[in-house]
């Protein structure tokens, strides 16, 4: 266990991140639906503002030193994958895919990461984790109901976002043996806006009016707060303790969707989400035990 393990602080920071993300999602969705803003415009403005807010933290990392890397091409690919995930997610919200459905499907990201770790990183996954992964996707199918008459392909956008964010996390894992965490953060924050700009230009629409700008600024500030809160959570408490609190984002986003749009999720959401959460919890616990065994051997 970490010397600086403060469970209550870690839990509160993770819950703060979940609440901030719920606000971000509902605000971004409201801006797209009510003001007709393209999701690419929302992504560009939201993350550009977040970077301005988080700039003081960026300076503490030592930008010049953090920029030193021999893996620049891989960092470009890593950030590109993250941006595609962001774009698909905001596209889903703009469509609109209800927040309750989107956030539950987004929770399949660790399942994709498990598949990628076996196929790409050549890690030994084992039968138990393969079964847990398959079970998790069954939960996603229950939420999606692809056999229903009213099924829409747009419902798959959050699944696409989950896939690209899982790919991003695998890139982080691969690069962690070459570069420091500060290098990862600096390149992410510096490259995310140029990528978002390239994707926003073809469909660019200038946000018009005080209300929409207040919404976008609020979303940017909350995005920065969420990222900072996650970093604080993992800094003050053990990862194995903090990780389960990430699942609080589901009820928080469901609550936000109900308050802002009046969306009430059907019963199948809770069944499917419970299956996904249990599958991810099993995989996370397995990974934690594996890491401890490796540290003990070392």
Curated annotation (Swiss-Prot):
Stretches that traverse the bilayer: 8-28, 35-55, 79-99, 101-121, 125-145, 151-171, 184-204, 211-231, 258-278
What subcellular compartments does it reside in?
A: Cell membrane
The answer to whether keyword rRNA processing applies is no
How would you describe this protein's topology in the membrane?
Multi-pass membrane protein
Q: Does the keyword Ligase apply?
A: no
Q: What does this protein do?
A: Transports riboflavin into the cell.
Top-level taxon in the UniProt lineage = Bacteria
Indicate the family of this protein. Belongs to the drug/metabolite transporter (DMT) superfamily. 10 TMS drug/metabolite exporter (DME) (TC 2.A.7.3) family.
Please state the protein's primary subcellular location: membrane
> Can you list the GO cellular component terms from the UniProt entry?
membrane; plasma membrane
One Pfam family of this chain: EamA
Q: Where is the EamA domain?
A: 10-144, 156-284
Question: How is this protein named in the record?
Answer: Riboflavin transporter
């Amino acid at each position: 266990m970490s010397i600086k393990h403060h469970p209550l602080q870690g839990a509160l920071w993770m819950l703060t991140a979940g609440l901030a993300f719920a606000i971000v999602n509902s605000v971004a969705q409201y801006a797209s639906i009510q003001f007709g803003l393209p999701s690419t415009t929302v992504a560009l403005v939201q993350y550009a503002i977040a970077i301005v807010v988080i700039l003081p933290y960026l300076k503490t990392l030592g930008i010049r030193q953090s920029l030193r890397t021999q893996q620049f091409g891989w960092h470009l690919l890593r950030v590109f994958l993250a941006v595609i995930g962001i774009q698909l997610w905001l596209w889903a919200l703009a469509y609109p895919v209800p927040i309750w459905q989107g956030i539950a499907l987004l929770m399949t990201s660790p399942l994709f990461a498990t598949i990628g770790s076996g196929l790409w990183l050549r890690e030994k996954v084992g039968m138990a984790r393969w079964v847990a992964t398959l079970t998790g996707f069954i939960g996603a199918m229950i939420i999606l109901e692809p056999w229903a008459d009213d099924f829409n392909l747009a419902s798959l956008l959050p699944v696409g976002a989950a896939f690209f964010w899982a790919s991003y996390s695998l890139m982080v894992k691969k690069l962690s043996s070459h570069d420091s965490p500060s290098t990862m953060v600096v390149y992410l924050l510096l490259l995310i806006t140029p990528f978002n700009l390239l994707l926003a230009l073809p469909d660019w629409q200038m946000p018009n009016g005080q209300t929409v700008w207040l919404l976008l600024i609020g979303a940017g500030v909350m995005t920065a707060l969420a990222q900072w809160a996650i970093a604080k959570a993992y800094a003050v408490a053990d990862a194995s303790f903090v990780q389960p609190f990430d699942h609080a984002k589901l009820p928080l986003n469901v609550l936000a969707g109900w308050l802002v749009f009046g969306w009430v999720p059907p019963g199948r959401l809770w069944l499917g989400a419970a299956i996904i959460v249990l599958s991810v919890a099993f995989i996370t616990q397995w990974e934690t035990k594996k890491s401890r065994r490796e540290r003990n051997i070392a």
